[in-house]
Amino acid sequence: MKIDQNNARILGVMSGSSLDGIDLALCHFRREGEGWAFQVEAATTVPYDAAMRERLLRATEANGLELARLHRDIGIAIGTACRDLLQGQSADLIASHGHTIFHQPDEGLTLQVG
């Protein structure tokens, strides 16, 4: 699949340290002259339930199996949130970095799940 480099619908997804949920924004970008214009077509936050929030809070203490399960479950939650926001429409690109478990740039370490 090739993306039109002058016109694209892009879905951005993130989950931050606030642990409030999965943030999504579907934007239509189009080139206008030398720059870009965009329109936000839809945006929402899908809240985490209490159990997922607790798992994310404790993730730095998790063992390998627990992290693997969290990675899978957050990935499913992100995919479901994307599907629900798009409601059968298409996006040219979905940009997601998952949820950051820890980030220690001074040591060159970061870990995202999902």
Report the location of each language-model feature.
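Short acidic/glycine-rich loops and adjacent helix/strand connectors
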Residues: 1-114
